[in-house]
Amino acid sequence: MSEDIFDAIIVGAGLAGSVAALVLAREGAQVLVIERGNSAGAKNVTGGRLYAHSLEHIIPGFADSAPVERLITHEKLAFMTEKSAMTMDYCNGDETSPSQRSYSVLRSKFDAWLMEQAEEAGAQLITGIRVDNLVQRDGKVVGVEADGDVIEAKTVLLADGVNSILAEKLGMAKRVKPTDVAVGVKELIELPKSVIEDRFQLQGNQGAACLFAGSPTDGLMGGGFLYTNENTLSLGLVCGLHHLHDAKKSVPQMLEDFKQHPAVAPLIAGGKLVEYSAHVVPEAGINMLPELVGDGVLIAGDAAGMCMNLGFTIRGMDLAIAAGEAAAKTVLSAMKSDDFSKQKLAEYRQHLESGPLRDMRMYQKLPAFLDNPRMFSGNPELAVGVARDLFTIDGSAPELMRKKILRHGKKVGFINLIKDGMKGVTVL
Protein backbone atom coordinates (compact mmCIF):
# COMPACT_ATOMS: atom_id res chain seq x y z
CA MET A 1 0.00 0.00 0.00
CA SER A 2 1.26 3.45 -0.86
CA GLU A 3 2.14 5.65 2.10
CA ASP A 4 0.84 8.69 0.21
CA ILE A 5 -2.83 9.60 0.44
CA PHE A 6 -3.89 11.71 -2.50
CA ASP A 7 -6.59 14.33 -2.29
CA ALA A 8 -8.06 12.83 -5.44
CA ILE A 9 -7.46 9.87 -7.70
CA ILE A 10 -8.98 10.26 -11.14
CA VAL A 11 -9.65 7.15 -13.22
CA GLY A 12 -9.35 8.07 -16.89
CA ALA A 13 -7.40 10.82 -18.66
CA GLY A 14 -10.16 11.89 -21.01
CA LEU A 15 -11.60 15.38 -21.06
CA ALA A 16 -13.49 15.14 -17.76
CA GLY A 17 -10.56 13.56 -15.95
CA SER A 18 -7.92 15.90 -17.34
CA VAL A 19 -9.94 19.03 -16.61
CA ALA A 20 -10.67 17.88 -13.07
CA ALA A 21 -6.96 17.21 -12.56
CA LEU A 22 -6.04 20.63 -13.94
CA VAL A 23 -8.50 22.58 -11.76
CA LEU A 24 -7.52 20.62 -8.65
CA ALA A 25 -3.78 20.89 -9.24
CA ARG A 26 -4.00 24.63 -9.78
CA GLU A 27 -5.28 24.92 -6.21
CA GLY A 28 -2.49 22.79 -4.80
CA ALA A 29 -4.39 19.52 -4.44
CA GLN A 30 -2.44 16.27 -4.65
CA VAL A 31 -3.90 14.56 -7.71
CA LEU A 32 -3.16 11.25 -9.39
CA VAL A 33 -4.64 10.37 -12.79
CA ILE A 34 -4.60 6.71 -13.83
CA GLU A 35 -5.09 5.99 -17.54
CA ARG A 36 -5.24 2.48 -18.99
CA GLY A 37 -4.05 3.66 -22.41
CA ASN A 38 -0.42 4.29 -23.19
CA SER A 39 -1.12 8.03 -23.23
CA ALA A 40 -3.96 10.43 -22.54
CA GLY A 41 -6.37 10.19 -25.46
CA ALA A 42 -4.99 6.91 -26.76
CA LYS A 43 -8.27 5.09 -26.05
CA ASN A 44 -10.63 7.98 -26.74
CA VAL A 45 -12.76 8.19 -29.87
CA THR A 46 -15.12 10.95 -30.96
CA GLY A 47 -16.65 12.26 -34.14
CA GLY A 48 -14.55 15.29 -33.62
CA ARG A 49 -16.36 18.54 -32.68
CA LEU A 50 -15.62 20.46 -29.50
CA TYR A 51 -17.88 23.33 -28.45
CA ALA A 52 -15.44 25.74 -26.85
CA HIS A 53 -17.50 27.45 -24.15
CA SER A 54 -16.77 25.15 -21.21
CA LEU A 55 -13.00 24.95 -21.78
CA GLU A 56 -12.77 28.65 -22.64
CA HIS A 57 -14.01 29.30 -19.12
CA ILE A 58 -11.12 27.27 -17.67
CA ILE A 59 -8.31 28.11 -20.12
CA PRO A 60 -9.16 31.45 -21.78
CA GLY A 61 -7.86 31.55 -25.33
CA PHE A 62 -6.99 27.84 -25.27
CA ALA A 63 -7.36 27.54 -29.05
CA ASP A 64 -4.26 29.69 -29.53
CA SER A 65 -2.03 26.95 -28.12
CA ALA A 66 -4.13 23.77 -28.19
CA PRO A 67 -3.90 21.35 -31.15
CA VAL A 68 -7.35 22.17 -32.53
CA GLU A 69 -7.81 21.29 -36.20
CA ARG A 70 -10.24 23.80 -37.72
CA LEU A 71 -12.72 26.45 -36.58
CA ILE A 72 -16.19 25.25 -37.62
CA THR A 73 -17.85 27.88 -39.81
CA HIS A 74 -19.80 25.69 -42.26
CA GLU A 75 -22.69 23.42 -41.25
CA LYS A 76 -24.42 20.86 -43.45
CA LEU A 77 -27.46 18.73 -42.59
CA ALA A 78 -28.40 16.13 -45.19
CA PHE A 79 -31.35 13.78 -45.61
CA MET A 80 -30.22 10.85 -47.72
CA THR A 81 -31.74 8.04 -49.71
CA GLU A 82 -29.66 5.34 -51.37
CA LYS A 83 -28.59 7.51 -54.31
CA SER A 84 -29.73 11.07 -53.51
CA ALA A 85 -29.52 13.73 -50.80
CA MET A 86 -31.31 16.93 -49.81
CA THR A 87 -28.86 19.14 -47.93
CA MET A 88 -29.27 22.28 -45.83
CA ASP A 89 -26.16 24.45 -45.76
CA TYR A 90 -25.30 27.20 -43.26
CA CYS A 91 -22.20 29.39 -43.42
CA ASN A 92 -21.40 31.60 -40.44
CA GLY A 93 -19.42 34.59 -41.64
CA ASP A 94 -20.14 36.73 -38.57
CA GLU A 95 -17.56 37.54 -35.94
CA THR A 96 -17.94 35.26 -32.92
CA SER A 97 -16.66 35.42 -29.36
CA PRO A 98 -14.28 32.65 -28.21
CA SER A 99 -17.02 31.01 -26.12
CA GLN A 100 -19.35 30.81 -29.14
CA ARG A 101 -16.88 28.91 -31.30
CA SER A 102 -16.44 25.22 -31.97
CA TYR A 103 -13.51 23.29 -33.37
CA SER A 104 -12.79 19.97 -35.00
CA VAL A 105 -10.30 18.04 -32.88
CA LEU A 106 -8.47 14.73 -32.89
CA ARG A 107 -8.66 13.31 -29.40
CA SER A 108 -5.29 11.57 -29.42
CA LYS A 109 -3.60 14.95 -29.85
CA PHE A 110 -6.03 17.16 -27.97
CA ASP A 111 -6.36 15.00 -24.85
CA ALA A 112 -2.59 14.63 -24.59
CA TRP A 113 -2.23 18.42 -24.69
CA LEU A 114 -4.92 18.92 -22.05
CA MET A 115 -3.32 16.38 -19.74
CA GLU A 116 0.01 18.17 -20.18
CA GLN A 117 -1.63 21.33 -18.83
CA ALA A 118 -2.73 19.38 -15.76
CA GLU A 119 0.74 17.92 -15.26
CA GLU A 120 2.35 21.34 -15.56
CA ALA A 121 -0.02 22.50 -12.83
CA GLY A 122 1.18 19.66 -10.59
CA ALA A 123 -1.01 16.64 -11.31
CA GLN A 124 0.60 13.20 -11.62
CA LEU A 125 -0.21 10.79 -14.45
CA ILE A 126 0.26 7.04 -14.66
CA THR A 127 -0.44 5.40 -18.03
CA GLY A 128 -0.77 1.81 -19.19
CA ILE A 129 -2.40 0.77 -15.91
CA ARG A 130 -5.95 -0.45 -15.42
CA VAL A 131 -7.86 0.18 -12.20
CA ASP A 132 -9.31 -3.20 -11.28
CA ASN A 133 -11.29 -2.30 -8.18
CA LEU A 134 -12.17 0.48 -5.81
CA VAL A 135 -11.06 0.16 -2.21
CA GLN A 136 -13.82 0.67 0.35
CA ARG A 137 -13.67 1.04 4.11
CA ASP A 138 -16.81 1.29 6.23
CA GLY A 139 -18.86 1.87 3.08
CA LYS A 140 -16.68 4.74 1.88
CA VAL A 141 -14.41 4.70 -1.17
CA VAL A 142 -10.87 5.35 0.07
CA GLY A 143 -8.75 4.46 -2.95
CA VAL A 144 -8.17 2.16 -5.89
CA GLU A 145 -6.54 -1.16 -6.60
CA ALA A 146 -4.44 -1.03 -9.76
CA ASP A 147 -1.98 -3.61 -11.03
CA GLY A 148 -1.94 -5.28 -7.63
CA ASP A 149 -1.21 -2.09 -5.70
CA VAL A 150 -3.57 -0.20 -3.42
CA ILE A 151 -3.40 3.58 -3.69
CA GLU A 152 -5.39 5.63 -1.19
CA ALA A 153 -7.20 8.91 -1.74
CA LYS A 154 -9.72 11.12 0.00
CA THR A 155 -11.87 11.07 -3.13
CA VAL A 156 -12.03 9.08 -6.35
CA LEU A 157 -13.43 10.48 -9.59
CA LEU A 158 -14.61 7.89 -12.08
CA ALA A 159 -14.09 9.28 -15.58
CA ASP A 160 -13.43 5.93 -17.21
CA GLY A 161 -15.86 6.18 -20.10
CA VAL A 162 -19.22 4.76 -21.06
CA ASN A 163 -20.20 1.45 -19.44
CA SER A 164 -18.07 2.09 -16.33
CA ILE A 165 -17.50 -1.30 -14.72
CA LEU A 166 -16.22 0.41 -11.56
CA ALA A 167 -19.43 2.42 -11.16
CA GLU A 168 -21.42 -0.75 -11.76
CA LYS A 169 -19.45 -2.64 -9.11
CA LEU A 170 -20.26 0.12 -6.61
CA GLY A 171 -23.95 -0.19 -7.43
CA MET A 172 -24.02 3.44 -8.58
CA ALA A 173 -24.72 2.56 -12.22
CA LYS A 174 -26.86 -0.13 -13.78
CA ARG A 175 -25.63 -2.34 -16.57
CA VAL A 176 -25.92 -0.37 -19.80
CA LYS A 177 -28.94 -1.36 -21.88
CA PRO A 178 -28.83 -1.58 -25.68
CA THR A 179 -31.39 1.24 -25.84
CA ASP A 180 -28.98 3.53 -23.96
CA VAL A 181 -26.04 3.41 -26.35
CA ALA A 182 -25.03 3.41 -29.99
CA VAL A 183 -22.13 1.89 -31.89
CA GLY A 184 -19.91 4.41 -33.61
CA VAL A 185 -17.31 3.70 -36.30
CA LYS A 186 -14.93 6.24 -37.75
CA GLU A 187 -12.26 6.51 -40.42
CA LEU A 188 -9.58 9.16 -40.57
CA ILE A 189 -8.93 9.95 -44.23
CA GLU A 190 -5.86 11.92 -45.22
CA LEU A 191 -6.04 14.55 -47.98
CA PRO A 192 -3.90 17.57 -48.81
CA LYS A 193 -4.91 20.69 -46.90
CA SER A 194 -5.57 22.58 -50.13
CA VAL A 195 -7.85 19.83 -51.45
CA ILE A 196 -9.96 19.88 -48.28
CA GLU A 197 -10.32 23.64 -48.49
CA ASP A 198 -11.32 23.53 -52.17
CA ARG A 199 -13.88 20.75 -51.75
CA PHE A 200 -15.56 22.30 -48.71
CA GLN A 201 -15.17 25.94 -49.81
CA LEU A 202 -13.02 26.84 -46.81
CA GLN A 203 -10.47 29.57 -46.27
CA GLY A 204 -7.57 29.51 -43.83
CA ASN A 205 -8.46 27.56 -40.70
CA GLN A 206 -12.19 27.40 -41.46
CA GLY A 207 -13.83 24.00 -41.07
CA ALA A 208 -17.04 22.17 -41.92
CA ALA A 209 -19.29 19.91 -39.87
CA CYS A 210 -21.66 17.64 -41.80
CA LEU A 211 -24.40 15.38 -40.42
CA PHE A 212 -26.36 12.85 -42.50
CA ALA A 213 -29.63 11.03 -41.74
CA GLY A 214 -31.31 8.21 -43.63
CA SER A 215 -29.38 5.81 -45.82
CA PRO A 216 -26.05 5.94 -43.89
CA THR A 217 -27.62 3.70 -41.22
CA ASP A 218 -29.93 1.93 -43.69
CA GLY A 219 -32.95 3.77 -42.29
CA LEU A 220 -32.24 2.85 -38.67
CA MET A 221 -31.81 5.27 -35.77
CA GLY A 222 -28.45 6.99 -36.11
CA GLY A 223 -26.61 8.88 -38.80
CA GLY A 224 -23.39 9.72 -40.54
CA PHE A 225 -20.91 12.49 -39.82
CA LEU A 226 -18.01 14.21 -41.52
CA TYR A 227 -15.68 16.78 -39.94
CA THR A 228 -12.84 18.55 -41.69
CA ASN A 229 -9.48 18.54 -39.91
CA GLU A 230 -6.34 20.35 -41.03
CA ASN A 231 -5.24 17.64 -43.48
CA THR A 232 -7.64 14.79 -42.72
CA LEU A 233 -11.37 14.09 -42.71
CA SER A 234 -13.15 12.40 -39.81
CA LEU A 235 -15.84 10.29 -41.49
CA GLY A 236 -18.10 7.82 -39.76
CA LEU A 237 -21.52 6.82 -38.56
CA VAL A 238 -23.38 5.96 -35.39
CA CYS A 239 -26.24 3.44 -35.11
CA GLY A 240 -28.41 2.62 -32.11
CA LEU A 241 -27.26 -0.67 -30.63
CA HIS A 242 -30.80 -1.95 -30.04
CA HIS A 243 -31.57 -1.56 -33.75
CA LEU A 244 -28.66 -3.59 -35.03
CA HIS A 245 -30.53 -6.89 -34.71
CA ASP A 246 -32.96 -5.51 -37.32
CA ALA A 247 -30.18 -4.33 -39.62
CA LYS A 248 -29.82 -5.87 -43.06
CA LYS A 249 -26.18 -4.76 -43.16
CA SER A 250 -23.27 -4.92 -40.77
CA VAL A 251 -21.98 -1.62 -39.41
CA PRO A 252 -18.75 -1.87 -41.46
CA GLN A 253 -20.86 -2.43 -44.60
CA MET A 254 -23.01 0.59 -43.73
CA LEU A 255 -19.84 2.67 -43.55
CA GLU A 256 -18.58 1.36 -46.90
CA ASP A 257 -21.90 2.13 -48.58
CA PHE A 258 -21.94 5.58 -46.98
CA LYS A 259 -18.50 6.28 -48.45
CA GLN A 260 -19.78 5.31 -51.91
CA HIS A 261 -22.84 7.58 -51.77
CA PRO A 262 -22.85 10.16 -54.60
CA ALA A 263 -23.02 12.99 -52.05
CA VAL A 264 -20.01 11.70 -50.10
CA ALA A 265 -17.70 9.91 -52.53
CA PRO A 266 -16.45 13.10 -54.28
CA LEU A 267 -15.57 14.63 -50.90
CA ILE A 268 -13.22 11.80 -49.94
CA ALA A 269 -11.96 10.82 -53.41
CA GLY A 270 -8.21 10.18 -53.49
CA GLY A 271 -7.97 10.12 -49.72
CA LYS A 272 -5.75 7.73 -47.80
CA LEU A 273 -7.15 5.78 -44.84
CA VAL A 274 -4.81 6.41 -41.90
CA GLU A 275 -6.92 5.28 -38.94
CA TYR A 276 -10.00 3.20 -38.14
CA SER A 277 -11.72 3.20 -34.76
CA ALA A 278 -14.93 2.05 -33.11
CA HIS A 279 -16.58 3.10 -29.89
CA VAL A 280 -19.75 2.74 -27.82
CA VAL A 281 -21.51 6.09 -27.45
CA PRO A 282 -24.02 7.10 -24.73
CA GLU A 283 -27.29 8.13 -26.38
CA ALA A 284 -30.05 8.16 -23.76
CA GLY A 285 -29.06 11.47 -22.16
CA ILE A 286 -30.33 12.14 -18.67
CA ASN A 287 -32.40 8.96 -18.83
CA MET A 288 -29.24 6.85 -18.37
CA LEU A 289 -27.71 9.03 -15.66
CA PRO A 290 -26.17 6.95 -12.85
CA GLU A 291 -26.04 7.92 -9.20
CA LEU A 292 -23.45 10.66 -9.54
CA VAL A 293 -22.24 10.84 -5.94
CA GLY A 294 -21.27 8.37 -3.23
CA ASP A 295 -19.19 8.45 -0.08
CA GLY A 296 -15.76 9.43 -1.36
CA VAL A 297 -16.62 9.03 -5.05
CA LEU A 298 -17.95 11.03 -8.02
CA ILE A 299 -18.77 10.07 -11.63
CA ALA A 300 -18.25 12.33 -14.67
CA GLY A 301 -18.14 12.39 -18.47
CA ASP A 302 -19.22 9.41 -20.57
CA ALA A 303 -19.20 7.27 -17.42
CA ALA A 304 -22.13 9.44 -16.30
CA GLY A 305 -23.84 9.27 -19.71
CA MET A 306 -23.21 12.95 -20.41
CA CYS A 307 -23.98 13.15 -24.10
CA MET A 308 -26.72 14.91 -26.06
CA ASN A 309 -27.78 14.05 -29.60
CA LEU A 310 -30.22 16.69 -30.79
CA GLY A 311 -30.14 15.54 -34.39
CA PHE A 312 -28.78 18.88 -35.59
CA THR A 313 -26.02 19.09 -32.95
CA ILE A 314 -24.17 16.40 -31.03
CA ARG A 315 -22.64 17.32 -27.69
CA GLY A 316 -20.47 15.33 -25.34
CA MET A 317 -17.03 16.87 -25.02
CA ASP A 318 -18.23 20.22 -23.69
CA LEU A 319 -20.42 18.43 -21.14
CA ALA A 320 -17.50 16.27 -20.01
CA ILE A 321 -15.31 19.34 -19.54
CA ALA A 322 -18.00 21.11 -17.51
CA ALA A 323 -18.50 18.00 -15.39
CA GLY A 324 -14.76 17.72 -14.75
CA GLU A 325 -14.66 21.31 -13.53
CA ALA A 326 -17.74 20.76 -11.36
CA ALA A 327 -16.18 17.65 -9.81
CA ALA A 328 -12.96 19.53 -9.05
CA LYS A 329 -14.82 22.42 -7.40
CA THR A 330 -16.72 19.91 -5.28
CA VAL A 331 -13.54 18.18 -4.12
CA LEU A 332 -11.87 21.50 -3.31
CA SER A 333 -14.85 22.46 -1.15
CA ALA A 334 -14.71 19.07 0.57
CA MET A 335 -11.00 19.54 1.26
CA LYS A 336 -11.67 22.80 3.09
CA SER A 337 -14.06 21.10 5.50
CA ASP A 338 -12.26 17.74 5.44
CA ASP A 339 -15.61 16.14 4.70
CA PHE A 340 -15.80 13.70 1.80
CA SER A 341 -19.14 12.18 2.68
CA LYS A 342 -21.89 11.64 0.14
CA GLN A 343 -23.83 14.49 1.72
CA LYS A 344 -20.96 16.95 1.24
CA LEU A 345 -20.08 15.73 -2.25
CA ALA A 346 -23.72 16.26 -3.26
CA GLU A 347 -22.58 19.82 -4.06
CA TYR A 348 -21.38 18.25 -7.32
CA ARG A 349 -24.94 17.84 -8.53
CA GLN A 350 -25.69 21.45 -7.64
CA HIS A 351 -22.79 22.58 -9.84
CA LEU A 352 -24.02 20.37 -12.68
CA GLU A 353 -27.52 21.84 -12.48
CA SER A 354 -26.22 25.12 -13.90
CA GLY A 355 -24.64 23.39 -16.89
CA PRO A 356 -24.78 19.80 -18.19
CA LEU A 357 -27.84 18.65 -16.23
CA ARG A 358 -29.76 21.80 -17.12
CA ASP A 359 -29.17 21.19 -20.82
CA MET A 360 -29.74 17.44 -20.64
CA ARG A 361 -32.98 17.86 -18.72
CA MET A 362 -34.34 20.32 -21.28
CA TYR A 363 -34.02 17.69 -24.02
CA GLN A 364 -34.69 14.58 -21.95
CA LYS A 365 -37.60 13.51 -24.19
CA LEU A 366 -35.63 13.87 -27.39
CA PRO A 367 -34.02 10.37 -27.48
CA ALA A 368 -37.48 8.77 -27.47
CA PHE A 369 -38.66 11.21 -30.15
CA LEU A 370 -35.71 10.38 -32.40
CA ASP A 371 -36.17 6.64 -31.84
CA ASN A 372 -38.82 6.61 -34.55
CA PRO A 373 -38.25 4.77 -37.86
CA ARG A 374 -39.91 7.60 -39.81
CA MET A 375 -37.12 9.95 -38.75
CA PHE A 376 -34.53 7.91 -40.61
CA SER A 377 -36.50 6.36 -43.48
CA GLY A 378 -39.83 8.01 -44.34
CA ASN A 379 -38.82 11.59 -43.62
CA PRO A 380 -35.54 11.50 -45.60
CA GLU A 381 -37.44 9.93 -48.50
CA LEU A 382 -40.05 12.69 -48.23
CA ALA A 383 -37.42 15.45 -48.24
CA VAL A 384 -35.49 13.96 -51.16
CA GLY A 385 -38.66 13.20 -53.13
CA VAL A 386 -40.00 16.74 -52.82
CA ALA A 387 -36.60 18.20 -53.77
CA ARG A 388 -36.36 15.90 -56.79
CA ASP A 389 -39.77 17.02 -58.08
CA LEU A 390 -39.04 20.70 -57.45
CA PHE A 391 -35.88 20.64 -59.52
CA THR A 392 -36.97 18.26 -62.29
CA ILE A 393 -38.48 19.61 -65.51
CA ASP A 394 -39.44 16.96 -68.07
CA GLY A 395 -41.83 18.82 -70.35
CA SER A 396 -45.01 17.38 -68.83
CA ALA A 397 -47.82 19.57 -67.49
CA PRO A 398 -46.64 21.51 -64.43
CA GLU A 399 -47.92 20.66 -60.98
CA LEU A 400 -48.44 23.09 -58.11
CA MET A 401 -45.84 22.86 -55.40
CA ARG A 402 -48.41 22.02 -52.73
CA LYS A 403 -49.57 19.05 -54.80
CA LYS A 404 -46.00 17.78 -55.08
CA ILE A 405 -45.62 17.99 -51.31
CA LEU A 406 -49.00 16.35 -50.69
CA ARG A 407 -48.21 13.49 -53.06
CA HIS A 408 -44.99 12.64 -51.23
CA GLY A 409 -46.57 13.28 -47.83
CA LYS A 410 -49.13 10.55 -48.49
CA LYS A 411 -46.32 8.00 -48.57
CA VAL A 412 -45.39 8.80 -44.97
CA GLY A 413 -48.98 9.39 -43.90
CA PHE A 414 -50.42 12.75 -42.96
CA ILE A 415 -51.54 11.51 -39.56
CA ASN A 416 -47.99 10.38 -38.88
CA LEU A 417 -46.59 13.73 -40.02
CA ILE A 418 -49.01 15.61 -37.78
CA LYS A 419 -48.24 13.37 -34.81
CA ASP A 420 -44.49 13.72 -35.34
CA GLY A 421 -44.81 17.47 -35.78
CA MET A 422 -46.84 17.93 -32.61
CA LYS A 423 -44.49 15.73 -30.63
CA GLY A 424 -41.50 17.57 -32.05
CA VAL A 425 -42.93 20.91 -30.92
CA THR A 426 -43.30 19.66 -27.34
CA VAL A 427 -39.83 18.09 -27.31
CA LEU A 428 -37.92 20.95 -28.93
UniProtKB/Swiss-Prot annotation:
InterPro entries per record: FAD-bd (IPR002938), FAD/NAD-bd_sf (IPR036188), FixC-like (IPR039651)
Cofactor(s) of this protein: FAD
Keywords of this entry: Electron transport, FAD, Flavoprotein, Oxidoreductase, Transport
Keyword Flavoprotein: yes
Gene Ontology molecular function: FAD binding; oxidoreductase activity
Cystine pairs: none
Family of the protein in this entry: Belongs to the ETF-QO/FixC family.
Function: Could be part of an electron transfer system required for anaerobic carnitine reduction.
PANTHER family with a match to the protein in the record: ELECTRON TRANSFER FLAVOPROTEIN-QUINONE OXIDOREDUCTASE YDIS-RELATED, PROTEIN FIXC
Protein name stated in the entry: Protein FixC
Organism this protein belongs to: Shigella flexneri
Lineage, opening ranks: Bacteria, Pseudomonadati, Pseudomonadota, Gammaproteobacteria, Enterobacterales
